Structures are given as structure tokens and as C-alpha cells.
Amino acid sequence: MEKNDYLVIEDIHKSFFGVEVLKGVNLSVAAGEVHGLLGGNGAGKSTLMNVLGGLYAKDSGRILIDGREVSITDSKAAERAGIGFIHQELKLFDLRSVAENIMISNLPTKGVFHLVDDKKKNESARKWLEMVGLKVEPATRLGELSIAEQQQVEIAKALSL
């Protein structure tokens, strides 16, 4: 592990029904770096992301964030560890506002979203929109945005968690 590595994946293994899909994966990412995973169908890209996101348990190996080993057992544990990712297929709501799409995952339980003041939702969402460089009003209905803009909303949502 290098001194400036923020995310370190060491010797990760994952099998399904006796078939080893991840075979000793190693990766280091410094703070502020952006990486992509490239590979053909069945190469293990999605499996690795699902292990990092807490959707699959790893069979062995270590995940370190900022020098601390983390145990990612579910998606909430991944969020607590500071890991988030966006899917190729957007997980957004066309009929809701941009602010609602960004902030909906930040609430502790379902069914309380309508209790949060719109002004507070918009103020909070505006910070994340600025971070991703999207110049739209938080109250804009998501369905009015282009697909590229919706992807930026998805990134803002992931960052907000």
C-alpha cells in the first residue's frame, strides 16, 4: 500500500457455485483519482463492483479505505465506508424533482420524504449539483433533463450518500 492510496483491494476472491469469478484481484486508487474497469463479458467487472458495494460477500481478501480495513457486509456498510457507485441503468424517478432524486436515499426510513421541507431539499441538492457541474434548478422535474444530465444527477446522488 502506497502512502497516498485511499482505496486498496488486496487479493479479493469470489466464487459462485464452485466457479471462481474473482481470482486474487488487486487494485490501489489514490484519493481524487478516477478509474474505469474494462473487460469482456464475464471478466468479473460487475462482480468486483458488487463486492465493493456490499451486494456480494467476498470469499477472501481485504478492502482498505484510507488505511483502515473495512468489512463490507451490505450496501449500508459500503455507504458508511464511503463507497458508492452508479449503475449503467439509471435508478432515478422521472416524475420527481432533481432535488428529490438526489436526497431520497439520504433519509433513514421510507415514507418520511414528504415531511422534509422543499427548501431544505433544494439547498442540500444544490451543493451536490454544483459539485458535478450540473447547472439546473433543483426543483426541475428529472424527466425534463437529457440522459447525460440525468447521469450527472445519479453521480450527485451517489456523492451525497
Task: Report the location of each language-model feature.
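Glycine-rich phosphate-binding loops of nucleotide-dependent enzymes
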Residues: 1-161
